[in-house]
């Protein structure tokens, strides 16, 4: 993959490195911990993300201030710059049509702020492993854990001995191979200086945008690994329940950065493709529209015999929204009611064609 990097300069003079790969509808990924434009392409941790997104989208990404190929020595890395930095890159990329935004981990906060400020420019909002409250804001055990991580970063990030960084790496990719763990350890060292790593983590730990979530007015897909050790799945559910009509997909994984070999990664790919409307399943019967991840989840709950109230509680939406989604499911399946939908779903599952 040919990588051409560009530089965009922010209002306060920080130079941000960004790149563009692939063809298709535009998708912009906000910066997240931690990336390096040049290293990520062939990375055993981030490479499959880049390949997937570049295959289906005009994919724009950038390194955040203080990291990677962007300016490494920066005075101000406060949260107030997250929106402005994203706006700077989007302007530099000369994106004129509505685009999809992808926010991974704390990148979700940047995307949420952008979607609220510029709803007319956002066609789809995708949040993976995101949160509205940083570790210190969540309090209790989460705050204690986060303080311990900050102390380890302060003591050992820059050491040649990777012991301290390995603790950090093990949280992000707990089931990684030796190659993946070694690569992530080295990424930590090469991407960000010790002092900057501590500053960036401290800023993230104090994030609190809970009050902004009801202001989102764009189609939103929230995905989260069920046993994520970095950001608890409860934070993903909080996002989905507070953002109006957001879809929520819970992935069977303990890994914050999904790895290529995981079934959860394939589910992530499928959910993103279907949510954004790219690369529809060619094997789908003619005339049958694809179900969204949420619609598939509702159909599964129907087959379990759940009532509308029970479904609403399970996926954190109102009963009215459940009825609206079920009407869409019936229409797409070509059935008239709940009973027919259950029969149709059962037949599809037995035939091995249920949305696969």
Residues covered by each model-derived region:
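Conserved HGGG/HGGXW glycine-rich cap/lid loop of the alpha/beta-hydrolase fold
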Residues: 7-69
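Active-site loop/oxyanion-hole signature of alpha/beta-hydrolase fold enzymes
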Residues: 45-51, 61-102
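Flexible "cap/lid" loop of the alpha/beta hydrolase fold
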Residues: 112, 116, 123-155
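Conserved alpha/beta-hydrolase catalytic His-Asp/Glu region
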Residues: 158-203, 212
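Short beta-strand/loop motif that positions the catalytic acidic residue
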Residues: 216, 222-224, 228
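Acidic catalytic loop of the alpha/beta-hydrolase fold
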Residues: 227-231, 257
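Catalytic active-site module of serine/aspartate enzymes centered on a nucleophile-bearing elbow/loop
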Residues: 246-286
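Helix-turn-helix DNA-binding segment
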Residues: 281-327, 332, 340-356
